[in-house]
């Protein structure tokens, strides 16, 4: 594989356009921006995000080869490691778990996005650090891929980005932080971030569909800039929510 650092700007753009056009991974994906836009935002040095990239590839393969992918929520690296040892193929990191007992604020919050925006990425990083340590231990014992008793600890992590903690720029930056931490998949919901409520609570407020889609586009742009095929999941509370900031956007969908 050719390193991005050895390609000119024009070659990087051409290679990215070719990947989008020919790679089955991107079939049906509409971005709303160009390869030139992505390359312009990358800078001259492209940093590799191996855990996020390989995790996304694993998760995509699971989604397309398994009837369903069973996961459990993990608050700590040890919990995630035990889940992998028990046979789970992916890890889920929920925002309500982080709100309740694993946020950067050291508080116990309700599921209303009250915790600091860096909280979920930090837990993702801790889980991947545990996976890395477990892998180092078995490697030091002479166990590698294909050997008896070898366990692939690097299960892909799907992380909760809530409603993006703000607007499109906030979603862009949060997605970057998730990828830097090694998340394989990230989901965003269409609630108003400033009034976010847990799924079973009343008073949920939706944003216009156009705004929700714009956040997803911003998140995909962030992944493209970071050079990872991160799985992007869209969640909606439309079935249960009774309020919306504007009816115009959803009336024209």
What role is predicted for each listed range?
Residues 1-3, 251-253:
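Short intrinsically disordered, low-complexity coil segments enriched in acidic
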Residues 12-13, 76:
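A broadly tuned, weak detector of single residues within folded domains
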Residues 19-62, 71-251:
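Alpha/beta enzyme core
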Residues 66-67:
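Active-site "substrate specificity/gating" loop of NAD(P)-dependent dehydrogenases
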Residues 3-12:
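Intrinsically disordered, low-complexity regulatory segments in eukaryotic proteins
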């Amino acid at each position: 594989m050719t390193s991005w650092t050895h390609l000119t700007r024009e070659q990087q753009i051409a290679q990215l356009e070719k990947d989008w056009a020919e790679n089955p991974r991107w079939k049906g994906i509409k971005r709303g921006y160009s390869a030139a836009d992505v390359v312009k935002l990358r800078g001259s040095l492209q940093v590799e995000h191996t855990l996020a990239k390989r995790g996304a590839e694993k998760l995509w393969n699971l989604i397309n080869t398994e009837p369903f992918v069973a996961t459990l929520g993990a608050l700590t690296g040890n919990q995630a490691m035990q889940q992998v040892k028990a046979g789970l193929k992916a890890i889920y990191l929920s925002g309500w778990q982080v709100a309740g007992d694993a946020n950067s604020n050291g508080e116990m919050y309700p599921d209303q996005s009250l915790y600091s925006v860096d909280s979920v990425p930090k837990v993702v990083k801790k889980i991947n650090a545990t996976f890395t340590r477990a892998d180092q231990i078995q490697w030091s014992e002479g166990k590698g891929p294909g050997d008896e008793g070898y366990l692939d600890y690097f299960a892909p992590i799907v992380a909760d980005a809530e409603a993006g903690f703000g607007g499109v720029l906030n979603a862009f930056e949060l997605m970057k932080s998730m990828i830097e931490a090694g998340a394989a998949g990230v989901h965003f919901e269409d609630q108003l971030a400033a009034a976010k409520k847990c799924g079973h609570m009343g008073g949920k407020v939706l944003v216009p569909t156009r705004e929700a889609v714009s956040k997803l586009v911003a998140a995909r742009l962030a992944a493209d800039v970071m050079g990872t095929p991160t799985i992007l999941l869209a969640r909606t509370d439309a079935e249960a929510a009774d309020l919306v900031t504007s009816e115009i956007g959803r009336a024209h969908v």
